[in-house]
């Protein structure tokens, strides 16, 4: 009987402790949100950017909320509906100012904790709507949809590793999340993400051609170079072939069917060839670039010639 009583007391105490921790976290979140409402300041660089949410003193409310970590997300989500004003202002050197709302800081906290970008619904003027302005369909239409997105993401990912989440982000609808994933997998030399990056390049090589897709495949190639597996060389060559072809389309003589003069991004071209070089094929990469120089240099405008020459000179030191 004494043992049973002690057991019940222990279980009751543990339940109280767990419940108390949950209540304490929710209360702490509310306290820091109250502090956000008192935040002041102006855009530091005059581009209309959000006034510094992470000052050197990490006792600031945004920094404190980030420290609370992933378990805080369900308590933060309701505050996305808080559109009350802080005392901080976005300022642009062109003259306009805009007072910052509480939920603009809340979304920053959520993005920093999750290492994944969510976005507040885009605000459109009546004139923009009437003119048929296009809004990215991947963005939420309203706060409720945003809250659902974040809650769904949290339930799926709260216990997963950053590696697993970044591998998922390679196929995310938001291109900022895809680029962030490419960069992270390369920077951490994540061999587990290699095949995912290679498959992503295969997808990008299909269908319509645009500069976003070309920048993505170059970013994937760059990360594969950092991961360093020679098995990636074949897919990287495909990226080099694709970018080389479209450079030719941009700079070949008009009578040969030039299209989109100047649309080719030289930085992506050299980025992909640099990846081929670091995988052990430097001579091949340089040879490819020198062929391009001999064929199209004379068709480039002066600034493009200078950019190409500068990049080719650097390439010889890869």
PLM region descriptions:
Residues 2-14:
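Bacterial N-terminal signal peptides
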């Amino acid at each position: 009987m004494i043992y049973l009583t002690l057991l019940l007391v222990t279980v009751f105490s543990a339940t109280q402790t767990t419940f108390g921790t949950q209540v304490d976290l929710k209360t702490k979140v509310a306290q820091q949100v109250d502090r956000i409402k008192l935040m002041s300041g102006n855009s530091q660089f005059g581009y209309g950017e959000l006034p510094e949410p992470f000052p050197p003193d990490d006792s600031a409310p945004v920094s404190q909320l980030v420290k609370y970590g992933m378990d805080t997300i369900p308590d933060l989500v309701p505050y996305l509906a808080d559109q009350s004003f802080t005392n901080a202002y976005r300022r642009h050197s062109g003259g306009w100012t805009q007072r910052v709302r509480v939920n603009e800081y809340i979304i920053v906290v959520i993005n920093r904790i999750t290492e994944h970008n969510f976005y507040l619904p885009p605000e459109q003027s009546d004139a923009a709507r009437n003119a048929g302005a296009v809004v990215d369909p991947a963005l939420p239409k309203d706060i409720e949809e945003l809250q659902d997105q974040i809650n769904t993401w949290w339930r799926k990912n709260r216990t997963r590793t950053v590696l697993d989440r970044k591998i998922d982000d390679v196929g995310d609808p938001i291109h900022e999340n895809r680029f962030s994933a490419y960069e992270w997998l390369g920077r951490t030399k994540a061999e587990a993400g290699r095949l995912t990056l290679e498959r992503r390049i295969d997808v990008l090589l299909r269908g319509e051609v645009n500069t976003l897709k070309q920048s993505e495949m170059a970013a994937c190639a760059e990360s594969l170079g950092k991961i360093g597996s020679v098995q990636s060389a074949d897919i990287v060559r495909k990226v080099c072939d694709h970018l080389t072809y479209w450079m030719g389309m941009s700079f070949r003589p008009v009578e040969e069917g030039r299209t989109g003069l100047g649309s080719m991004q030289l930085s992506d071209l050299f980025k992909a060839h640099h990846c081929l070089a670091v995988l052990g094929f430097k001579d091949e990469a340089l040879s490819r670039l020198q062929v391009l120089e001999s064929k199209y240099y004379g068709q480039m405008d002066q600034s493009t010639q200078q950019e190409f020459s500068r990049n080719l000179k650097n390439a010889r030191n890869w």
